[in-house]
Amino acid sequence: MPEETLLAFDFGEKKIGVAIGNTLTCHARPLEIIFSERRDERFGRIQALLEAWRPQRVVVGLALATDGGDQPATLRCRRFANQLHGRFGVTVELVDERGSSMEAQEKLGSHAPDDAMAAAIILQRYLDRLA
């Protein structure tokens, strides 16, 4: 597989965690948290990130219920993924995000904002599947 840069998003209505990684190192790391409830501000920042990093594809965490089924947040994540594809023409992969926030809190060892770390965990899961 050729080397690819990937961005990942842990979508929330008030915050979006962002992580970056690539297929050469198969390593993901937290990048930033987008704090905004306004759609235009969120997508403006996402556009800037896409222009700066030029990912070949993006990964979006899919908020499934504990039993693996859909819940209201699942639809919001799918809608966000569709918006990314529609607005920016980027390939989008969905990855089960169950437990990523708890794992992020464990890694951080605090109650600090964990959205970017959760995005890194989601992206790492995707990269591990590719390996």
UniProtKB/Swiss-Prot annotation:
Gene Ontology cellular component list: cytosol
Source species: Bordetella avium (strain 197N)
Disulfide linkage: none
Gene Ontology biological-process entries: rRNA 5'-end processing
Gene3D superfamilies per the UniProt record, alphabetical: YqgF/RNase H-like domain (3.30.420.140)
Chief subcellular location: cytoplasm
Molecular function GO labels: nuclease activity
EC number: 3.1.-.-
Entry function: Could be a nuclease involved in processing of the 5'-end of pre-16S rRNA.
Matching Pfam families: RuvX (PF03652)
Family of the protein in this entry: Belongs to the YqgF nuclease family.
Protein name per the record: Putative pre-16S rRNA nuclease
